[in-house]
C-alpha cells in the first residue's frame, strides 16, 4: 500500500519529539534518541499491507512505536493502542492530545482484559513471541485480519509452524500473517 504522508507530518514529528523528550526526562519510558530511524522502521511495515484497515490494534504500544506514526499516516483508521504500563499509557495519551490524533483510543490494560472486537490489522513491535501475540489477541481477529509484527533475527524460530511472509529491511524483519492462516 502506498501511503502519502499528511502535509503536517513533519510538524507532527517535531511535536512528538518534544513530547517524548519532555515526558522521558521525568518518566524514562524509552532510550531512543534517533527518531528518524524509528519513524522509518514504523512506516516501512506499511509497504506490506495491501488494504487500508478501518480498525487497527497495536499491542504493547509503549512509547508509541509504531502505532503513533502509523496513526499519523492512516488518519481514517481507528487505532486502539493497548498498553498496560500506566506511565506509558499516560505518555500515549499526552502525545495523542498534543498531536491532535483523533483516530487513537488508548487502552491502559492488557488486550486480553478488554472486551473483544474485530480488527482489520493487528500490529506489535518486539513485545513477545508471535504465537503468544496471536493467543492474547484471540477474539480480536477473524479470517480477514492481517497481523504485522515488527521482529528481529529470531522471527523464523518464533513462527514455528505458523505460515507467514517475512520481509527484511536492515536489521528489522516484518512478519505478515493472515487471519485465515491462524484461525
From Swiss-Prot:
GO CC entries: cytosol
Keywords of the record: Cytoplasm, Methyltransferase, rRNA processing, S-adenosyl-L-methionine, Transferase
Molecular function in Gene Ontology: rRNA (guanine-N7-)-methyltransferase activity
The organism's place on the tree of life at top rank: Bacteria
Residues annotated for S-adenosyl-L-methionine binding in this entry: 60, 65, 111-112, 125
Major localisation: cytoplasm
Reaction catalyzed: guanosine(527) in 16S rRNA + S-adenosyl-L-methionine = N(7)-methylguanosine(527) in 16S rRNA + S-adenosyl-L-homocysteine
UniProt key word Transmembrane: no
Subcellular localization(s) per the UniProt record: Cytoplasm
Record carries keyword Cell cycle: no
Class of enzymatic activity (EC top level): transferase
Cleavable signal peptide: none
Record-annotated disulphide pairs: none
InterPro entries: rRNA_ssu_MeTfrase_G, SAM-dependent_MTases_sf
EC id: 2.1.1.170
Function statement: Specifically methylates the N7 position of guanine in position 527 of 16S rRNA.
Family listed: Belongs to the methyltransferase superfamily. RNA methyltransferase RsmG family.
Protein name in UniProt: Ribosomal RNA small subunit methyltransferase G
Amino acid at each position: 500500500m502506498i501511503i502519502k504522508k499528511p502535509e503536517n507530518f513533519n510538524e507532527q514529528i517535531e511535536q512528538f519529539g518534544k513530547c517524548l523528550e519532555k515526558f522521558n526526562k521525568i518518566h524514562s519510558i524509552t532510550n531512543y534518541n534517533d527518531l528518524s530511524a524509528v519513524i522509518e522502521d514504523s512506516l516501512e511495515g506499511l509497504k506490506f499491507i495491501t488494504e487500508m484497515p478501518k480498525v487497527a490494534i497495536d499491542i504493547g504500544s509503549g512509547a508509541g512505536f509504531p502505532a503513533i506514526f502509523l496513526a499519523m499516516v492512516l488518519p481514517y483508521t481507528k487505532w486502539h493502542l493497548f498498553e498496560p504500563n500506566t506511565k506509558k499509557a499516560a505518555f500515549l495519551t499526552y502525545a495523542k492530545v498534543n498531536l491532535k490524533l483523533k483516530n487513537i483510543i488508548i487502552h491502559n490494560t492488557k488486550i486480553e482484559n478488554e472486551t473483544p472486537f474485530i480488527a482489520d490489522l493487528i500490529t506489535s513491535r518486539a513485545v513477545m513471541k508471535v504465537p503468544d501475540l496471536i493467543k492474547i489477541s484471540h477474539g480480536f481477529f477473524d479470517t480477514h485480519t492481517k497481523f504485522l509484527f515488527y521482529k528481529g533475527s529470531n522471527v523464523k524460530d518464533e513462527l514455528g509452524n505458523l505460515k507467514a511472509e517475512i520481509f527484511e529491511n536492515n536489521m528489522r524483519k516484518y512478519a505478515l500473517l493472515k487471519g485465515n492462516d491462524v484461525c
